[in-house]
Amino acid sequence: MFWNRGEKMHIFKDIYDYRELLKTNVKKDIRGKYKGSFLGVLWSFINPLLQVVVYWIVFPYLMRGAGGDNYLVYLITGLIPWTFFLTTVSAGTTSIKANAGIIKKVYFPREILLISQVLSGLVNFMISCVIIFVFCFAFGYGISIQVLMLPVVALIQSILILGIILILSSLNAYIQDLEYIVSFLLTMGMYATPVIYDLSLLDGAGTLGKIIRMNPLTILVMSYRDIFMYHVWPPMKQLGAVALLALVILIIGYKVFKKLEKGFAEEL
Protein backbone atom coordinates (compact mmCIF):
# COMPACT_ATOMS: atom_id res chain seq x y z
CA MET A 1 0.00 0.00 0.00
CA PHE A 2 1.07 3.60 -0.62
CA TRP A 3 0.51 4.52 3.01
CA ASN A 4 1.56 1.83 5.45
CA ARG A 5 0.33 1.95 9.02
CA GLY A 6 3.23 2.71 11.32
CA GLU A 7 5.31 4.18 8.51
CA LYS A 8 6.90 7.42 9.68
CA MET A 9 8.33 10.47 8.04
CA HIS A 10 12.04 10.52 8.78
CA ILE A 11 12.73 13.72 6.92
CA PHE A 12 13.47 15.76 10.06
CA LYS A 13 15.65 12.99 11.49
CA ASP A 14 17.52 12.84 8.19
CA ILE A 15 18.10 16.59 8.31
CA TYR A 16 19.72 16.22 11.73
CA ASP A 17 21.67 13.03 11.02
CA TYR A 18 23.03 14.32 7.71
CA ARG A 19 23.35 17.97 8.70
CA GLU A 20 27.02 18.15 7.71
CA LEU A 21 26.27 16.77 4.24
CA LEU A 22 23.39 19.21 4.03
CA LYS A 23 25.64 22.15 4.94
CA THR A 24 28.20 21.04 2.37
CA ASN A 25 25.57 20.75 -0.36
CA VAL A 26 24.07 24.15 0.42
CA LYS A 27 27.50 25.81 0.33
CA LYS A 28 28.30 24.02 -2.92
CA ASP A 29 24.99 25.09 -4.48
CA ILE A 30 25.50 28.73 -3.52
CA ARG A 31 29.17 28.91 -4.48
CA GLY A 32 28.75 26.77 -7.60
CA LYS A 33 25.94 28.95 -8.89
CA TYR A 34 28.34 31.83 -9.50
CA LYS A 35 31.62 29.93 -9.70
CA GLY A 36 34.03 31.51 -12.14
CA SER A 37 32.06 34.75 -12.41
CA PHE A 38 33.80 38.02 -11.66
CA LEU A 39 31.04 39.38 -9.41
CA GLY A 40 30.35 36.10 -7.61
CA VAL A 41 27.59 36.24 -4.99
CA LEU A 42 26.80 39.83 -5.99
CA TRP A 43 24.72 38.27 -8.76
CA SER A 44 22.21 37.41 -6.01
CA PHE A 45 21.53 41.16 -5.95
CA ILE A 46 22.09 41.93 -9.61
CA ASN A 47 19.80 39.25 -11.09
CA PRO A 48 16.63 40.42 -9.30
CA LEU A 49 17.44 44.04 -10.11
CA LEU A 50 17.87 43.24 -13.81
CA GLN A 51 14.55 41.39 -13.82
CA VAL A 52 12.84 44.34 -12.17
CA VAL A 53 14.32 46.73 -14.74
CA VAL A 54 13.07 44.55 -17.61
CA TYR A 55 9.51 44.42 -16.27
CA TRP A 56 9.64 48.11 -15.41
CA ILE A 57 10.46 48.85 -19.06
CA VAL A 58 8.07 46.31 -20.60
CA PHE A 59 5.03 47.25 -18.49
CA PRO A 60 5.43 51.02 -18.06
CA TYR A 61 1.82 51.95 -18.78
CA LEU A 62 -0.19 48.74 -18.55
CA MET A 63 0.66 47.99 -14.92
CA ARG A 64 1.78 51.33 -13.51
CA GLY A 65 -1.43 51.68 -11.50
CA ALA A 66 -0.72 48.51 -9.54
CA GLY A 67 0.36 49.06 -5.97
CA GLY A 68 -0.52 52.76 -5.98
CA ASP A 69 2.13 55.36 -6.77
CA ASN A 70 5.12 53.08 -6.28
CA TYR A 71 4.75 50.28 -8.80
CA LEU A 72 8.49 49.65 -8.62
CA VAL A 73 8.28 48.63 -4.95
CA TYR A 74 5.11 46.66 -5.68
CA LEU A 75 6.95 44.82 -8.45
CA ILE A 76 10.02 44.03 -6.34
CA THR A 77 7.99 42.71 -3.40
CA GLY A 78 6.26 40.27 -5.74
CA LEU A 79 9.03 39.37 -8.15
CA ILE A 80 11.67 38.38 -5.59
CA PRO A 81 9.40 35.89 -3.71
CA TRP A 82 8.20 34.51 -7.06
CA THR A 83 11.81 34.10 -8.25
CA PHE A 84 12.53 32.09 -5.08
CA PHE A 85 9.69 29.73 -6.00
CA LEU A 86 10.54 29.59 -9.71
CA THR A 87 14.28 28.93 -9.43
CA THR A 88 14.00 26.42 -6.57
CA VAL A 89 11.22 24.38 -8.17
CA SER A 90 13.10 24.39 -11.50
CA ALA A 91 16.36 23.24 -9.92
CA GLY A 92 14.61 20.80 -7.60
CA THR A 93 12.73 19.10 -10.43
CA THR A 94 16.00 18.09 -12.13
CA SER A 95 17.99 17.52 -8.94
CA ILE A 96 17.74 13.71 -8.92
CA LYS A 97 18.76 13.44 -12.58
CA ALA A 98 21.56 15.96 -12.11
CA ASN A 99 23.01 13.88 -9.27
CA ALA A 100 22.60 10.49 -10.96
CA GLY A 101 26.29 9.67 -10.59
CA ILE A 102 26.45 10.03 -6.82
CA ILE A 103 23.04 8.38 -6.36
CA LYS A 104 24.34 5.23 -8.07
CA LYS A 105 27.56 5.13 -6.04
CA VAL A 106 26.89 6.39 -2.53
CA TYR A 107 24.09 5.75 -0.05
CA PHE A 108 22.48 8.69 1.68
CA PRO A 109 18.85 9.79 2.02
CA ARG A 110 18.07 11.08 -1.46
CA GLU A 111 15.73 13.72 -0.09
CA ILE A 112 18.81 15.53 1.24
CA LEU A 113 19.39 16.71 -2.34
CA LEU A 114 15.97 18.38 -2.38
CA ILE A 115 16.30 19.85 1.09
CA SER A 116 19.64 21.40 0.14
CA GLN A 117 18.02 22.94 -2.96
CA VAL A 118 15.34 24.56 -0.83
CA LEU A 119 17.83 25.81 1.76
CA SER A 120 20.18 27.30 -0.84
CA GLY A 121 17.17 28.92 -2.52
CA LEU A 122 16.05 30.28 0.85
CA VAL A 123 19.52 31.74 1.51
CA ASN A 124 19.50 33.45 -1.89
CA PHE A 125 15.98 34.73 -1.20
CA MET A 126 17.02 36.22 2.13
CA ILE A 127 20.00 37.89 0.46
CA SER A 128 17.66 39.30 -2.18
CA CYS A 129 15.36 40.61 0.56
CA VAL A 130 18.08 43.19 1.24
CA ILE A 131 17.04 44.74 -2.09
CA ILE A 132 13.44 44.93 -0.90
CA PHE A 133 14.49 46.67 2.31
CA VAL A 134 16.65 49.15 0.39
CA PHE A 135 13.81 50.09 -1.95
CA CYS A 136 11.28 50.25 0.88
CA PHE A 137 13.48 52.72 2.74
CA ALA A 138 14.28 54.67 -0.45
CA PHE A 139 10.57 55.14 -1.23
CA GLY A 140 9.58 56.00 2.32
CA TYR A 141 8.00 52.74 3.43
CA GLY A 142 10.55 52.05 6.12
CA ILE A 143 10.15 49.00 8.33
CA SER A 144 7.45 47.94 10.78
CA ILE A 145 6.85 45.31 13.43
CA GLN A 146 5.14 43.17 10.77
CA VAL A 147 8.62 42.25 9.51
CA LEU A 148 8.60 39.66 12.31
CA MET A 149 6.30 37.64 10.06
CA LEU A 150 8.91 37.45 7.28
CA PRO A 151 10.58 34.24 8.58
CA VAL A 152 7.14 32.65 9.09
CA VAL A 153 5.96 33.36 5.54
CA ALA A 154 9.34 32.29 4.12
CA LEU A 155 9.16 29.03 6.11
CA ILE A 156 5.66 28.27 4.80
CA GLN A 157 6.83 28.93 1.25
CA SER A 158 9.90 26.72 1.77
CA ILE A 159 7.78 23.82 3.06
CA LEU A 160 5.43 24.20 0.09
CA ILE A 161 8.36 24.18 -2.34
CA LEU A 162 9.94 21.13 -0.69
CA GLY A 163 6.71 19.15 -0.95
CA ILE A 164 6.31 20.08 -4.61
CA ILE A 165 9.87 19.18 -5.64
CA LEU A 166 9.78 15.89 -3.74
CA ILE A 167 6.96 14.90 -6.08
CA LEU A 168 8.34 16.44 -9.27
CA SER A 169 11.93 15.25 -8.87
CA SER A 170 10.89 11.65 -8.25
CA LEU A 171 8.49 11.65 -11.21
CA ASN A 172 11.12 13.31 -13.40
CA ALA A 173 13.37 10.28 -12.93
CA TYR A 174 10.72 8.20 -14.73
CA ILE A 175 9.11 10.71 -17.11
CA GLN A 176 11.68 12.12 -19.52
CA ASP A 177 9.80 15.23 -20.63
CA LEU A 178 8.41 16.27 -17.25
CA GLU A 179 10.99 19.01 -16.65
CA TYR A 180 9.91 20.77 -19.85
CA ILE A 181 6.27 20.58 -18.83
CA VAL A 182 7.17 22.01 -15.42
CA SER A 183 9.11 24.83 -17.08
CA PHE A 184 6.05 25.76 -19.14
CA LEU A 185 3.72 25.57 -16.14
CA LEU A 186 6.04 27.80 -14.11
CA THR A 187 6.02 30.37 -16.89
CA MET A 188 2.23 30.32 -16.91
CA GLY A 189 2.16 30.28 -13.12
CA MET A 190 3.61 33.75 -12.92
CA TYR A 191 0.52 35.11 -14.64
CA ALA A 192 -1.69 33.17 -12.25
CA THR A 193 0.00 35.04 -9.39
CA PRO A 194 -0.21 38.83 -8.84
CA VAL A 195 3.48 39.44 -9.37
CA ILE A 196 3.26 42.18 -12.00
CA TYR A 197 -0.41 43.14 -11.69
CA ASP A 198 -2.76 44.20 -8.92
CA LEU A 199 -5.49 41.85 -7.72
CA SER A 200 -8.00 44.65 -8.23
CA LEU A 201 -7.63 44.07 -11.98
CA LEU A 202 -9.43 40.76 -11.43
CA ASP A 203 -12.56 42.38 -10.01
CA GLY A 204 -15.40 41.08 -12.11
CA ALA A 205 -13.24 38.32 -13.61
CA GLY A 206 -15.59 35.67 -12.24
CA THR A 207 -14.25 32.15 -11.81
CA LEU A 208 -10.77 33.06 -13.05
CA GLY A 209 -10.48 35.78 -10.43
CA LYS A 210 -11.60 33.40 -7.68
CA ILE A 211 -9.06 30.77 -8.75
CA ILE A 212 -6.19 33.26 -8.78
CA ARG A 213 -7.21 34.65 -5.37
CA MET A 214 -7.22 31.08 -3.98
CA ASN A 215 -3.79 30.35 -5.44
CA PRO A 216 -1.46 29.64 -2.47
CA LEU A 217 1.27 31.71 -4.11
CA THR A 218 -1.12 34.65 -4.39
CA ILE A 219 -1.63 34.53 -0.63
CA LEU A 220 2.12 34.23 -0.02
CA VAL A 221 3.06 37.07 -2.38
CA MET A 222 0.39 39.36 -0.94
CA SER A 223 1.58 38.44 2.56
CA TYR A 224 5.07 39.65 1.66
CA ARG A 225 3.53 42.90 0.40
CA ASP A 226 1.56 43.26 3.64
CA ILE A 227 4.85 42.96 5.51
CA PHE A 228 7.02 45.22 3.36
CA MET A 229 4.62 47.74 1.79
CA TYR A 230 1.36 47.99 3.67
CA HIS A 231 2.63 47.38 7.22
CA VAL A 232 -0.35 45.24 8.19
CA TRP A 233 -0.42 41.69 9.47
CA PRO A 234 -0.93 39.10 6.72
CA PRO A 235 -4.37 37.43 6.74
CA MET A 236 -3.72 34.76 9.35
CA LYS A 237 -6.67 32.58 8.38
CA GLN A 238 -5.60 32.40 4.74
CA LEU A 239 -1.94 32.05 5.64
CA GLY A 240 -2.80 29.25 8.07
CA ALA A 241 -4.69 27.46 5.29
CA VAL A 242 -1.63 27.73 3.03
CA ALA A 243 0.57 26.41 5.85
CA LEU A 244 -1.76 23.42 6.30
CA LEU A 245 -1.79 22.80 2.55
CA ALA A 246 2.01 23.01 2.47
CA LEU A 247 2.28 20.38 5.21
CA VAL A 248 -0.17 18.08 3.40
CA ILE A 249 1.80 18.43 0.15
CA LEU A 250 5.03 17.78 2.07
CA ILE A 251 3.65 14.56 3.57
CA ILE A 252 2.29 13.38 0.21
CA GLY A 253 5.51 14.42 -1.52
CA TYR A 254 7.63 12.51 0.97
CA LYS A 255 5.52 9.37 0.54
CA VAL A 256 5.66 9.60 -3.26
CA PHE A 257 9.40 10.20 -3.15
CA LYS A 258 10.13 7.24 -0.85
CA LYS A 259 7.90 5.01 -2.99
CA LEU A 260 9.64 5.91 -6.24
CA GLU A 261 13.24 6.30 -5.06
CA LYS A 262 13.69 2.51 -5.06
CA GLY A 263 13.87 2.62 -8.84
CA PHE A 264 16.08 5.69 -9.22
CA ALA A 265 19.29 3.76 -9.85
CA GLU A 266 17.67 1.72 -12.64
CA GLU A 267 15.88 4.65 -14.28
CA LEU A 268 18.73 7.17 -14.23
Which positions does each model-derived feature cover?
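Hydrophobic transmembrane alpha-helices and immediately adjacent juxtamembrane helices
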Residues: M1-L268
